[in-house]
From Swiss-Prot:
GO molecular function, one term: ATP binding
Signal peptide: none
Family, per entry: Belongs to the RecN family.
GO biological process, one term: DNA recombination
Record key words, sorted: ATP-binding, DNA damage, DNA repair, Nucleotide-binding
Protein name: DNA repair protein RecN
Keyword DNA repair: yes
């Protein structure tokens, strides 16, 4: 629940702190003192758009700070709130409470804080919206909208799981339909793409390039282009190292010379010379190996230019591929791998199209069944909700009023992109929230024709319809017990006995919820457990919030009773009203 609200420089309020208890709290005050700013502050904590024009004149920023406790909530709600705190890095105070804060700058961006941590406004609202339910005169206007009416019915019916299942199937159905339409429209394009890929892969496979082959060919061609020069160099080097058969005794090559040198050194008894003999022997081994490698090199050299021609022809084949598919052969091979993968994805067979058609049909059937199931839930809940709201209206001095809820199938044209055939044969429009059109109906006196709520209810009647609806939703535990419900002048257009009944109903609601009401009706204010008054505190027009004592309450109620605050008769009337309300057993 909300235990404290601090407002600074918001509208008419300069600095104000209000403390709240369990039960029923009312805020009253003269017109223009800033009562609505209290609710505006709570809306800001709930993530409402920050409006810099709300910052009080002369101030740089406005601040709204709320302190919340969770001790009165059920375990599931507490666990959900704690998850929000943990994900935001927010911390509780030592007493277990949580501080939520919103700061609005006149010139810069607004900021949000939760448990001492800066958070996005969405995170702040994720926490406070679990604790606060705010209702104002604008909500009465929203109640006339079909989507708001459907949302209220779904809350009462606890239809969230059925709605989510429907939405999931609808998303899958729409995706399958898009895929099917795309498949049909692109069948020719896909077939042409497949032909191009097959041709390219066949061309590449025919050439059969190997990784790095184009680079190796460049080196091979360079070598073969200088074949005579290479052969002469290798032959000369080999002859120099091993000699020739017709050489004289002094020019038989390095091998023979090194062999004779080693033998001469080995024949000596001198240790130093014998050590040198080993070094010469090592040199001889190196030279002999070089001679062998030169021989192998000469054997591998082509005898004519045909090898060069073959290499050049192969290079021309590879260049045909690199001109079309990639800059080098390794790139061509990568392109081929990607092309094979793409070709595997391109299912251009009739079987693939038929499979898509079957899948789309299956999803349409499942979606149709989910839509019917959701409609059944809504239709059953609509009867109960209408009955309970009508009963609440009777308790609010509207005994002859009748509230109805119509749930009908929204029909679609054949050209509608979300037309869905139901098992009943109806062609329904599969909207994001189902195929149902939900409409609240109302008539103030039974026997008259029931009309849509937007066309039949006056301002005062609409206030009572909304209160009745919220009471039913709250008492049916669709609004967690222990949470805070805020009503901003929803009793507009109401007076007399109806106002008394509204006060009684709000007081009963406060048995399970914290109820905070901004009102101009003394009959409603008299039923409150705590009475807060918003009043001007200085010549600059600033306002503050004051908690009223018993005598103060009498004076304020007398003022609200047609401005009779200073008269004995006004106080007597106010005292009687207060005593009657406080002694009401609320049965």
């Amino acid at each position: 629940m909300l235990t404290e609200l601090r407002i600074e420089s918001l509208g008419a309020i300069s600095v104000a702190t209000a403390e709240f208890d369990r039960g029923f709290t009312v805020l009253t005050g003269e017109t223009g003192t800033g009562k609505t700013m209290v609710v505006t502050g709570l809306h800001l904590l709930g993530g409402a758009r920050a409006d810099a024009t709300r910052v009080r004149s002369g101030a740089d920023r406005a601040v709204v700070e709320g302190r919340f406790t969770t001790t009165d909530l059920d375990d599931a709600t507490v666990a959900g709130l704690q998850a929000v705190l943990d994900s935001s890095g927010a911390e509780r105070d030592e007493d277990g409470s949580v501080i939520a804060l919103r700061s609005i700058s006149r010139d810069g961006p607004s900021r949000a804080y939760l448990g001492g941590r800066g958070v996005p406004a969405k995170s702040l609202s994720g926490f406070t919206n679990e604790l606060l339910t705010l209702h104002g005169q604008n909500d009465q206007l929203r109640l006339m909208r079909p989507d708001e009416q459907r949302g209220a019915l779904d809350r009462f019916a606890a239809a969230g799981e059925a709605v989510q299942r429907y939405r999931k199937l609808r998303d899958a159905w729409l995706t399958a339909r898009r895929d099917l339409v795309d498949r049909r429209n692109r069948a020719r394009e896909l077939a042409q793409e497949a032909d191009r890929l097959k041709f390219a892969l066949n061309e590449i496979d025919t050439v059969d390039p190997q990784p790095g082959e184009d680079v190796a060919l460049v080196a091979d061609i360079a070598r073969l282009s200088e074949l005579d020069t290479l052969r002469e160099a290798a032959t000369t080097a080999r002859a120099t190292l091993c000699g020739t058969p017709d050489a004289d005794a002094f020019d038989r090559g390095a091998v023979d010379s090194l062999g004779r040198a080693r033998a001469a050194l080995q024949s000596s008894d001198d240790a130093a010379l014998r050590g040198l003999a080993e070094q010469v022997g090592e040199a001889l081994t190196v030279v002999v190996d070089a001679v062998a490698e030169l021989g192998a090199y000469l054997d591998e050299l082509p005898a004519d230019a045909s090898a060069l021609d073959a290499k050049l022809a192969r290079q021309a084949q590879l260049r045909t591929l690199t001109r079309k598919y990639a800059a080098d052969i390794d790139g061509v091979l990568r392109w081929a791998d990607e092309a094979r993968a793409r070709l595997a994805q391109l299912d251009v067979s009739e079987e693939g199209l038929a499979a898509l058609e079957r899948r789309t049909g299956e999803l349409a059937h499942e979606l149709g069944q989910a839509a019917v199931d959701l409609s059944t839930i809504r239709r059953k809940a609509a009867k109960r909700l209408a009955k309970e709201v009508s009963a609440e209206l009777s308790a609010l001095a509207m005994a002859d009023a009748e509230f109805t809820i119509g749930v009908t199938t929204g029909l679609a044209d054949h050209g509608d992109p979300v037309a869905l055939a139901l098992a009943s044969g109806e062609l329904a429009r599969a909207g994001a929230d189902g195929v149902d059109a939900v409409e609240f109906g109302f008539v103030a006196h039974r026997g008259m024709t029931v009309l849509p709520l937007a066309k039949s209810a006056s301002g005062g009647e609409l206030s009572r319809v909304m209160l009745s609806l919220e009471v039913v939703l709250a008492t049916s535990r669709k609004q967690a017990a222990g949470t805070t419900m805020v009503f901003d002048e929803i009793d507009a257009g109401v007076g007399g006995w109806a106002a008394v009944q509204i006060g009684r109903r709000l007081a009963r609601l406060a048995r399970t919820h914290q109820v905070i009401v901004v009102t101009h009706l003394p009959q409603v204010a008299a039923y409150a457990d705590v009475h807060l008054m918003v009043q001007r505190t200085g010549r600059d027009g600033a306002s503050g919030v004051r908690r009223l004592t018993s005598e103060d309450r009498v004076a304020e109620l007398a003022r609200m009773l047609a401005g009779l605050g200073d008269s004995d008769s006004g106080r007597a009337h106010a005292r009687e009203l207060l005593e009657t309300a406080q002694n009401d057993e609320l049965t």
